[in-house]
Swiss-Prot record:
Reaction it catalyzes: tRNA(Phe) + L-phenylalanine + ATP = L-phenylalanyl-tRNA(Phe) + AMP + diphosphate + H(+)
Enzyme class: ligase
Protein family according to the UniProt entry: Belongs to the class-II aminoacyl-tRNA synthetase family. Phe-tRNA synthetase alpha subunit type 2 subfamily.
Cofactor note text: Binds 2 magnesium ions per tetramer.
NCBIfam families for this protein: pheS (TIGR00468), PRK04172.1 (NF003210)
Gene that encodes the chain: pheS
Positions that bind L-phenylalanine: 340, 423, 448
Subcellular location: Cytoplasm
InterPro entries: aa-tRNA-synth_II, aa-tRNA-synth_II/BPL/LPL, Phe-tRNA-synth_IIc_asu, Phe_tRNA_ligase_alpha_bac/arc, Phenylalanyl-tRNA_Synthase
Residues in the signal sequence: none
UniProt key word Metal-binding: yes
The protein, known as: Phenylalanine--tRNA ligase alpha subunit
Sorted UniProt keywords: Aminoacyl-tRNA synthetase, ATP-binding, Cytoplasm, Ligase, Magnesium, Metal-binding, Nucleotide-binding, Protein biosynthesis
Gene source species: Methanococcus maripaludis (strain DSM 14266 / JCM 13030 / NBRC 101832 / S2 / LL)
Length: 500
């Protein structure tokens, strides 16, 4: 094992001093102070050395604290003013003559809190002008002894309060010592030779042959290095990008739709009855302006017939929902509650000839639900939804597509179980297996019902599925609270790998 010269110098310090533990000042006699930490870090990675950190909390007076130490804290200034002028009380409004503007409110509050005054008809009446103030005593102590570890618990509380009042600052000082370990002790039993070394060759060295006089230090790729956190995309953005790339690689085309939709497109076309709980204000954001939108009349009539009695163009295809369909409800505007509306609008836009061709489309975008914010719900989140339309696709194809999609996202174990959704039949939920967590639900899917497709003149089967990307991100990054994705916790953002 070949060590860097700085590592050798540091070990030589232990060898010559015959000490087991040394501090920074002691080591700096053998090696430049700025090189000690780097060499110690390398040696700790080799298990030659242990870096011991002792953290000490210090408190120090700031400008206001020093000023208060000389002239008294605001409460004392008021007491001294009354005492020096032989007054029994002063009007509250006169505090501005004694104190700085930003001291007035705090002084009165602290005088009352400490039980030193009474307020009588707008006047401040002192009970005791010769009181002893523990805060003043602590200010004096801080000026002499900044080491917070020597203070009692009660004194620490007073220090923290003085910090809140702006009299002092707290800081943490790290004192490092270095202890040689068994591997290092074995190494220094032998003489340590320090040769002049170089890390790169120049043309002059090669031509002159001087390179022979130097030791060329080899590179060790296994040496631990300091963590570097370069700029990178937000983890949620990477999830969206990854899902997008996976679907495009599977032959899907991306489609988009507007955030504001009519209830017709968001609910009615999906065969969701107008009295369904999901359409209540408790679950949906209704738009105030514009509060209504345009709905294609011909399609509206077809969807209305499907809802009321299951008929379209006089042909009965189901029982429908057997209720009175309200066209005004269909025209109300909402923030879309799912991205399925993008697929529905895509299907509605297909011409008669285009319906003969197979189609694979998906949408990744924001959706909105009137949810109470908690560890697993947000009112705004990203959803991914896709459809496959072709002559010969069936439920087995849907399962195969989903398993391949999830496999490409890194989930090798997938299981399917039955589910219910108003607009698909049959329907399923896909669960993935994660070590240490077991089986976890991830997405819902199914085959669009005829009541959804018939109004658009589509006779071919359409497979559909949807997945909440926030849920996927939580599983990927090991989060238990969905809010952590959006807290802008810089420490978490720096350390979260986005390429796993």
């Amino acid at each position: 094992m070949e060590l860097h010269n700085d590592e050798k110098r540091l070990l030589k310090a232990f060898q010559e001093s015959n000490e087991k533990t040394m501090n920074l000042e002691e080591l700096s006699k053998y090696i430049e102070k700025e090189k000690v930490m780097r060499a110690a870090f390398w040696l700790s990675g080799r298990d030659f050395l242990e870096i011991i950190e002792n953290k000490t909390k210090l408190c120090e007076l700031n400008e206001l604290g020093n000023k208060s130490l000389d002239f008294g804290i605001p409460e004392r200034k008021v007491a001294n003013y009354i005492k020096e002028n032989n007054l029994e009380s002063i009007p509250i409004k006169e505090l501005s003559k004694i104190l700085e503007k930003d001291e007035t409110g705090a002084a009165l509050g602290n005088l009352k809190k400490k039980g030193l005054v009474e307020i009588d008809k707008g006047n401040i009446v002192f009970k005791n002008l010769n009181y002893e103030d523990i805060e003043e005593e602590i200010l004096k102590k801080v000026s002499i002894n900044p080491d917070l570890s020597t203070y009692s618990k009660d004194e620490v509380k007073i220090v923290e309060n003085l910090k809140k009042r702006g009299f002092l600052n707290l800081k943490e000082v790290v004192d490092r010592s270095f202890e040689i370990k068994d591997a290092g002790t074995e190494f220094i039993k032998n003489p340590i030779e320090i040769k002049e070394e170089i890390t790169q060759l120049t043309r002059e060295m090669i031509v002159s042959g001087k390179w022979k006089d130097y030791f060329i230090r080899p590179y060790d790729a296994k040496i631990p290095t300091e963590d570097i956190y370069p700029a990178k995309a937000h983890p949620m953005s990477k999830i969206i990008q990854e899902v997008n790339e996976v679907l495009i690689s599977m032959g899907f085309k991306e489609v988009k739709s507007q955030i504001v939709q009519t209830e017709f497109w968001n609910f009615d076309t999906l065969f969701e009855p107008q009295d369904h709980p999901a359409r209540d204000m408790q679950d949906t954001f209704f738009v105030k302006y514009p509060n209504t939108g345009k709905v294609p009349k011909e399609l509206l009539e077809k969807v209305k017939g499907i809802h009321e009695c299951g008929t379209i163009d006089g042909e009965k295809i189901s029982k429908g929902w057997c209720y009175k369909f309200d066209e005004n409800v269909s025209k109300r505007t909402v923030l879309r509650t799912h991205t399925t509306v993008s697929s529905i609008k895509y299907l509605a836009s297909l011409s008669e000839s285009e319906r003969e061709n197979p189609h694979k489309v998906f949408c990744i975008d924001r959706v909105f639900r009137n949810e109470t914010i908690d560890y697993k719900h947000l009112p705004e989140f990203y959803q991914c939804e896709g459809i496959v339309m072709a002559e010969d696709v069936n439920f087995d194809n849907l399962v195969g597509i989903l398993k391949e999609f999830l496999r490409k996202l890194g989930f090798e174990k997938v299981r399917i179980r039955p589910a219910y959704f108003p607009f698909t039949e049959p329907s399923l939920e896909a669960e993935v297996y994660m070590e240490g967590k077991g089986w976890l639900e991830l997405l819902g899917a199914g085959v669009f019902r005829p009541e959804v497709l018939e109004p658009f003149g589509i006779k071919k089967p359409v497979l559909a599925w949807g997945i909440g990307l926030s849920r996927l991100a939580m599983l990927r990054f090991g989060l238990t609270d969905i809010r952590e994705l959006h807290k802008n916790d810089m420490e978490w953002l720096k350390k979260t790998a986005v390429n796993e």
